């Protein structure tokens, strides 16, 4: 009887609530319905805050400014000479290098929500954001400080990520960010590392084998499959899940072990100036899973809203985030990924969406 009254009083709301109950909204990569997110986060965050962490933790960003004429000159020179048959899908797409000032907002989120971070490193190719004044807390690191000369310049994120452990003075424990990943709420250090140094492994519910069976063809999937194959061969451990598209807690010593064990495999793809289907994705797959196998990482939960910043759905995601901000139910993080140029000129749209969200 109560349902009938509700239906006749406001049929549109009744139908909306009925559909939401039957088909819950899922915006994250762990198959958690929107109305259950905050319950899980509240309990997780309480547990993650119980034991203090007394070791230093750094943050590492990789960043590029595609509007820099000198960078464009280098990019165009090597783009014209590359064999397009051997580069991965979207590897030459300008969207991979587009700058919408995401770093300004992502860096601001780290400073605001992760105040316990010791130092922030921004890895670039002879660039520095014009709005940034580096200091002891925020340092800009050039590729030449990490990567051997014969592999430079490189426009391959997998090559850059393979050398993160060579950042001068980097802490043993660090968190790797792409500049399109944003911390959405205050988080304790325990969200990323246990007090005994074990790293969080933010595992997705997605399946590598399912994506492959569907015909997905990207350098990221190829690198994950190749990495999983190597680990399965050496440790008899089958891996079928990628990580959530968010920040990645890492340990410098595990990079060193990975290089010791797989130096030949790593060296093989370092000459690839653009991403190919023969790369390994060390920072975002190989090393996190090697860390798990070695017992220094454990599966953990990060509720991250992941969406294509160029798609029509982007505005809906930002609206959901704005509503969650008002209700105090924001996820741990979100990723406004810019992965192809089907939308011809999204620059102002993406910049406006970010500006509107962070100005609220």
From Swiss-Prot:
Superkingdom of this protein's organism: Bacteria
Picking any one GO molecular function of the record gives:
transferase activity, transferring phosphorus-containing groups
Q: What is its EC number?
A: 2.7.-.-
Q: Name one GO biological process term.
A: polysaccharide biosynthetic process
Name the keywords, alphabetized: Exopolysaccharide synthesis, Transferase
Q: What does this chain do?
A: Part of a group II capsule biosynthesis locus.
Return the protein name.
Capsular polysaccharide phosphotransferase LcbA
Species this protein is from: Aeromonas hydrophila
